[in-house]
Structures are given as C-alpha cells and as structure tokens.
C-alpha cells in the first residue's frame, strides 16, 4: 500500500530499531535488512509479508475475552509497530473503531493507571509548568503537524478522569491516521495534568497522575497560556485540537485562541460539523430545507450550543435572518427550555435562550419553564438532538409526539458511551413505526422493523475531523474558520447514501471514510484559500497535495545511514 518505492535511510540498528514503533517491521524485515541493520538472530528466521502479519495479529485479537482486552492488545501493537497497527485497522475498521475509540476508550480512560504499559505522548503537569519548553523538546518527533490535547476534565460522558484522559488524544490521533491519512510520524497526544477532583482517583494508590485537586481560575489560565506559547515556539504551524475540556473552559479557550493559532475544538466544532452534515443530508433526502426545520436540543452545554450555532449559521446561508433562525432552535436543560431571564445562564447559552414573549402562549405543565415534552409539542419539532449524557430522556411519549408533527423526524441521540444514550435506535424506530431517521453518537447494530433492515448511521466525529485535519495540512491553512467547518458539513452531506441514491443510511459506511475524508479535505482547503488563509493554488494542485499527505500503512525499504 505504500505510494513510494524510494528507500528510507536510517541510522538506527539492532534492538534499538526494533523498539521504535514508527520504524519497526518485526518479522517483515528482509534478509538484506537483517544483515545491514544487525538484526540476525533477533527475529525468527522466516520473513513475512505485512498481510501475513495482519492475519496473525487479527487471530490473536479475536482471542481477547473482552472489549477492554481488545483495546489493550491493539494499543500494544501500536506501541510496537505502528505500520502493522494501522494496516490492521485498515482491514477491519468497522469492527475495531468502537474498540480503539468510543465506547471502549471510555473504560480504558477509567482504567488507565491500572492498564498502563508504556509511554506514548507527553504528560505536562502543573508542578512542571516552568519546564514546558524542555518537555516539548523531549518529543521524539520533530515534524509535528497535529496535536490533540486534553486536560481530562470532561472525558466523554464520564467526567474527570485525571491523566487517564490520555486515552482520548491517543484514540483521536489514531483516527486522524486511519480515517484521514495523517502519518503517525506527524501526530502528538498531550495531557495537561492540572490535578483531578475525582476523589476515587486521588484515593487510588495506583493513580499515576499529580495527586492534587484541580487548578482553576487564573492559575489554570496562566498554565494554558504557558502551554500555548511553548507549542507555538516549538511547532508554529501545528494544528492544535482541544479535546474534552469542561464546558466552563472549552468555549472560552476556543474563543481566546482561535484567531491566534490554527486550533480546533472537536467537542464543539467537530460535533457541530458532523451533526449539521447529518441534518443537511436528511433535509436533502426529504427535499426540504434546513430553514424549514424546528430543532429541539436536550442538553445545553458547549457541545449542544456549538451544534445549535452551526445550524443557525447554515440557516442564515439559506437566507433566513439571524432572528428567524434562532426562533427555530430550542435548547432544553435539566430545568427546562432555556428562556431569557433564566438564572445562571452562561454567555453562550444566553444567545440561544428563547424570548419569553415567543413562548408565553404555550400550553405547558406547572414547572417554571417548559419541559421537553412541552417544547416538542408547542414548537412543532421536526428534529430532536440529544447531548445530555442521560439515559432514557427520549421517552416513548416524547418520540410519539415528535412523530405527530413530522412524518420522518430526524432523531439524533448523540451521547456517549452507549450507557448514556437518550434512546436506542430500536426504541425510536418502534415508536415511530419505522419512519424516523436515526443517527447516534455510539455504534449500534442494524434494526429489523416492518420486514426491512435499517442501518443506523453513527454520527461520529471521525467523519469530520480527519478530513478537516487533512485539508489543513495539505493546504497549510493558518486558521480554522466557521466557513471552513460549514464546507466540511456540506461535503459530508453530499456523501450520504440517501442523497446519492445508494442506500437508506443517513451517513456513508465507515468503509468509505477515507474517500469521505478526501472530499472534506478538498472542500476545507478550497474554503481556506478563498478566505486568504492558505496560498491559492489550482484544484488539481490541492488534490495532489491531499494525496501526497495521505499516508498509507505499508513498509518501505530501509538503507543504513552512517551516523
């Protein structure tokens, strides 16, 4: 699968070469390479192809007793031979994506200190804040193009996981490579260890992180600033992805730094982009416009509000005014519908609160603010999106009421992991007589209903962020803008089988994700050029750059270079 036959000249040899995951070939080193690099006797005599290696490791993988065991096994391959790891993923992506990322990665984060095997990435702790430059210099990779960083305060729907959150940057970057073709040589996972408020971790004798309550306020902000400044000195052109920061920090950090460097928050912007892409695909399939939809959210955190703002931006592109668009978005939290005058609303929530006058005539219960069923009923909802992290919030009554207003409602229970999902696809389809369009955050098996098989689209950020990263790297964009994200959403929608006429799923199958990433990369890069954020070239040149940067897992020939 390699795209070049040129040999790679390296100076490493013997056991040290076998201990380098980016260069190790294991049993695939050729007889000539074994002599040239002092490997005779360090490997079994038989020389294998990468296909034979994949067969062996897949057989071993199938013997693992649990999903967590499978995750640990795959990570051990990654830490030994990255090329083999990604070739294995390429052969079994549908099967292994839920293992290397959601939902299994959540358990891996919870058990991080117990299952820890070897180092990967950088751990930057608050007590070592004066040595961040030294820590970044210790990274063994010099040409980093994408960093995923977390402070682990909001890991999936599991909350504060301390340094265990490292599993998320590792998993995300694995998807940048498997889905978006970014070479693992150009990626770096980082955890910012600012302590933890998770008492279970603090009391755990095996916990490997800084045993201290979380730093907050000005101390936290100053630490983040030190980190950002150090990253810009070390890798000034890097794409920095913020991952799983708490909502109180996620949006402020994005707003503060998005105009200073090429950065991206996948929880806010990636989730929003894939959700809007899914919504656009559903609208295209039903011959409707986005502006015709009434969208109800359950969960008004940074992710939900980020999706809502992205939908509003898309509605405005269709021609609605901002006020018209905002009237079609309804945010429900644990207290009810976000309404102006509500206490303790964050700034990004206030923008999405409904005006009291607009809902004063609603028929509702006795609570101070309209509840979910009230909102679905009075708003005439056509789309229901769950980002609450609360199992079972989409009740049968709510879904049936939604179906009254819309023959084919779009229902998107996006919470991860599966134990946190607002309703299962089987429940949603049963309660709508098989008429709902369903996209979920976690993977679900197809559903049999009314004599047909319904394939469930996984509204997974892996459809979006690898393509965005590939586009940014290919065109060397200096920033990531809302219009670039909208370009990604539109490109994803155009790939929907419902739009292309190749199936009934809202999103394309994962086996096509590399082609989807290429299309998204082109759309993102063209928009970056249009905004003056990348050097303008022809579309042909962009396509060539995308292919040039798309790494495929295969072994190159090695030649010895003297030190």
Swiss-Prot record:
Homotetramer. Its cofactor is Mg(2+); Mn(2+). GO terms for biological process: malate metabolic process. GO terms for cellular component: cytosol. It comes from Pseudomonas savastanoi pv. phaseolicola (strain 1448A / Race 6). InterPro entries: Aminoacid_DH-like_N_sf, Malic_enzyme_CS, Malic_N_dom, Malic_N_dom_sf, Malic_NAD-bd, Malic_OxRdtase, NAD(P)-bd_dom_sf, NAD_malic_enz_proteobac. Divalent metal cations. Prefers magnesium or manganese. It holds the Pfam family malic. This is NAD-dependent malic enzyme. The record marks 267 as: Important for activity. NAD(+) binds at residues 154, 267, 416. The active site is at residues 101, 172. A divalent metal cation binds at residues 243-244, 267. It is an enzyme of class 1 (oxidoreductase). It catalyses: (S)-malate + NAD(+) = pyruvate + CO2 + NADH; oxaloacetate + H(+) = pyruvate + CO2. Belongs to the malic enzymes family. GO terms for molecular function: malate dehydrogenase (decarboxylating) (NAD+) activity; metal ion binding; NAD binding; oxaloacetate decarboxylase activity. Its EC number is 1.1.1.38. Keywords: Metal-binding, NAD, Oxidoreductase.
């Amino acid at each position: 699968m390699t795209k070049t036959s040129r040999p790679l000249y390296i100076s490493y040899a013997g056991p040290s070469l076998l201990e380098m995951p980016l260069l190790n070939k294991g049993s695939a080193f050729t007889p000539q390479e074994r002599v040239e690099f002092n490997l005779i006797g360090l490997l079994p005599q038989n020389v294998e192809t990468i296909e034979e290696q994949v067969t062996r490791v897949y057989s071993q993988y199938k013997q693992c007793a649990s999903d967590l065991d499978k995750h640990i096994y795959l990570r051990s391959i990654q830490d030994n031979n990255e090329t083999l790891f990604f070739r294995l993923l390429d052969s079994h992506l549908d099967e292994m994506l839920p293992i290397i990322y959601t939902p299994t990665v959540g358990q891996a984060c919870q058990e991080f200190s117990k299952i820890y095997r070897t180092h990967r990435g950088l751990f930057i702790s608050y007590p070592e804040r004066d040595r961040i430059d030294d820590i970044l210099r210790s990274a063994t990779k010099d040409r980093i193009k994408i960093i995923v960083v977390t402070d682990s305060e909001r890991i999936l729907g599991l909350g504060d996981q301390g340094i265990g959150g490292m599993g998320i940057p590792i998993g995300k970057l694995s998807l940048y490579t498997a889905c978006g073709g970014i070479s693992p040589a150009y990626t770096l996972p980082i955890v910012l260890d600012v302590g933890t408020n998770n008492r279970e971790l603090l009391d755990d004798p095996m916990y490997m992180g800084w045993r201290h309550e979380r730093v907050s306020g000005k101390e936290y902000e100053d630490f983040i600033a030190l980190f950002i400044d150090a990253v810009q000195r070390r890798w000034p052109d890097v794409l920095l992805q913020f991952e799983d920061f708490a909502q109180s920090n996620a949006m402020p950090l994005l707003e503060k730094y998005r105009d200073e460097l090429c950065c991206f928050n996948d929880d806010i912007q990636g989730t929003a982009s894939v959700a809007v892409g899914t919504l656009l695909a559903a609208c295209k399939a039903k011959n409707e416009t986005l502006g015709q939809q009434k969208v109800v959210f359950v969960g008004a955190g940074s992710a939900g509000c980020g999706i809502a703002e992205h939908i509003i931006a898309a509605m405005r592109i269709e021609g609605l005014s901002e006020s018209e668009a905002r009237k079609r978005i309804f945010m429900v939290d644990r207290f009810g519908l976000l309404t102006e005058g509500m206490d303790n609303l964050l700034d990004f929530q206030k923008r999405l609160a409904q005006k009291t006058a607009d809902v004063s005539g609603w028929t509702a219960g006795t609570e101070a603010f309209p509840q979910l069923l009230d909102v679905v009923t009075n708003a005439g909802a056509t789309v229901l999106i769950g980002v609450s992290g609360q199992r079972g919030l989409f009740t049968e009554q709510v879904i049936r009421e939604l179906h009254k207003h819309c023959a084919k409602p779009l229902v998107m229970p996006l919470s991860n992991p599966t134990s946190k999902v607002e309703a299962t696809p089987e429940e949603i389809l049963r309660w709508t007589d098989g008429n709902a369009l369903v996209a979920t955050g976690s993977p679900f098996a197809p559903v049999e209903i009314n004599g047909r098989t319904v394939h469930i689209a996984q509204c997974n950020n892996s459809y979006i962020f690898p393509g965005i990263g590939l586009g940014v790297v290919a065109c060397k964009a200096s920033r990531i803008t809302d219009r670039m994200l909208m370009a990604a959403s539109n490109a994803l929608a155009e790939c929907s089988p419902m739009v292309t006429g190749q199936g009934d799923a809202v999103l394309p199958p994962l086996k096509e994700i590399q082609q989807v990433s290429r299309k998204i990369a082109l759309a993102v890069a063209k928009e970056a050029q249009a905004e003056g954020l990348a050097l303008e070239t022809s579309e042909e040149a962009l396509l060539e750059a995308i292919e040039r940067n798309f790494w495929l897992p295969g072994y190159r020939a090695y030649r010895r270079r003297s030190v």
